[in-house]
Amino acid sequence: MQATARRLWRLVMVGSEHIEMIPAPDNQIWSANVNGTPVEVLAPSNAILLDVLRDKVGTLGVKRGCDLGTCGCCTVMVDGKPRLSCLCLAGQVENTSITTVEGLANGAHLAPIQACFAEYGGSQCGFCTPGFLISAQALLNENDSPTDQDIACAIDGNLCRCTGYQQIIESIQGAAAIHRGEVEPPAPASDPHPDPHPEGPEEPNMPPGHAR
């Protein structure tokens, strides 16, 4: 076993002499409208949208899950349509309007979809919740009277290991009723609080590794 490992190491070392290192991509100015605010950041030309939103813009509600487009927790809206930010180059959506979970609330007050997720137990561990909220809001923006099947199709790309999905469907139906004006939104559990880290990744009091 050790001899085999040594032979493989020699092959790697010999082969590496003929490999030219790929140069690092150039940094470029990336601009978009994120949650209603024009932003311009310096990012590598090959950066994915997920990295730019988290590490450059500071919207840490966009979660990194699988990096393969299978879990949905990185979902954002691009010009009103849900999109997986882990599979999207930032350059592909430059100069678009992007909405992350931070952009759903009205100031410090929760959006109906957020309030209903809290009211109906649509969130447990919470890691998948931002993606579900974005997918659900994109649906409600186009259809405020969805069937359960409509909802199932809209959240088909979002995975949750906690809730069993029924509470999520109930949460979205509750928000749909609010959008239709049939019921009042749930009362907030507490007075709204301001963002404790308004500067995102540049906030000096953020814990180490906060943007990863």
What is each model feature region?
Residues 2-195, 199-212:
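Signature of N-terminal electron-transfer/Fe-S-associated modules in redox systems
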